[in-house]
Swiss-Prot record:
<dbReference type="Pfam" id="PF00031">
    <property type="entry name" value="Cystatin"/>
</dbReference>
<protein>
    <recommendedName>
        <fullName>Cystatin cpi-1</fullName>
    </recommendedName>
</protein>
<dbReference type="GO" id="GO:0031982">
    <property type="term" value="C:vesicle"/>
</dbReference>
<keyword id="KW-0646">Protease inhibitor</keyword>
<feature type="short sequence motif" description="Secondary area of contact">
    <location>
        <begin position="68"/>
        <end position="72"/>
    </location>
</feature>
<dbReference type="GO" id="GO:0004869">
    <property type="term" value="F:cysteine-type endopeptidase inhibitor activity"/>
</dbReference>
<feature type="signal peptide">
    <location>
        <begin position="1"/>
        <end position="19"/>
    </location>
</feature>
<comment type="similarity">
    <text>Belongs to the cystatin family.</text>
</comment>
<dbReference type="InterPro" id="IPR000010">
    <property type="entry name" value="Cystatin_dom"/>
</dbReference>
<feature type="disulfide bond">
    <location>
        <begin position="86"/>
        <end position="98"/>
    </location>
</feature>
<keyword id="KW-1015">Disulfide bond</keyword>
<keyword id="KW-0789">Thiol protease inhibitor</keyword>
<keyword id="KW-0732">Signal</keyword>
<dbReference type="GO" id="GO:0005615">
    <property type="term" value="C:extracellular space"/>
</dbReference>
<dbReference type="InterPro" id="IPR046350">
    <property type="entry name" value="Cystatin_sf"/>
</dbReference>
<comment type="function">
    <text>Cysteine protease inhibitor which inhibits members of the peptidase C1 family. Does not inhibit asparaginyl endopeptidase.</text>
</comment>
<dbReference type="GO" id="GO:0005737">
    <property type="term" value="C:cytoplasm"/>
</dbReference>
């Protein structure tokens, strides 16, 4: 009787440790993955809200991408963005339709995106 209880206890401890490790580890994604591209494009609105530059930035490409399962999905992205000729604050302005201002340098951003669609949550943080 003693042996099965010990065995089950050991299995429980191992499974909890393994589950925690899976939950806390990050997975590397291909930068061209469709999901990653969609998240990066959607994140640009909040990136533009958080920058001090007077014009909008436009996503050029995703440089690197990792994900982590938390209470939702956390995306760790490094993106390259280019300044555009479109001013911030213009009603209905879509940076994807703006012209890149080639006289200004591109900028690399490291961002964290927390997405929990069932809670209607999509939060972007510049790091």
């Amino acid at each position: 009787m003693f042996f099965p209880i010990v065995w089950l206890s050991v299995l429980l401890i191992i499974s909890k440790s393994f589950a925690r490790e899976i939950r806390l580890s990050r997975a590397t994604y291909n930068e061209d993955d469709e999901e990653i591209q969609e998240v990066a494009e959607k994140a640009m609105e909040q990136v533009n809200d958080q920058t001090r530059y007077r014009n909008l930035y436009k996503l050029v490409r995703v440089i690197s991408a990792q994900t982590q399962v938390v209470a939702g999905i956390k995306y760790y992205l490094t993106i390259l963005a280019a300044p555009t000729t479109c001013r911030k604050g213009a009603v209905g302005m879509n940076p994807m339709k703006c012209t890149i201002d080639s006289s200004k340098p591109t900028k690399q951003f490291k961002i964290e995106v927390w997405s929990a669609p069932w809670q209607n949550t999509f939060k972007v943080t510049l790091t």
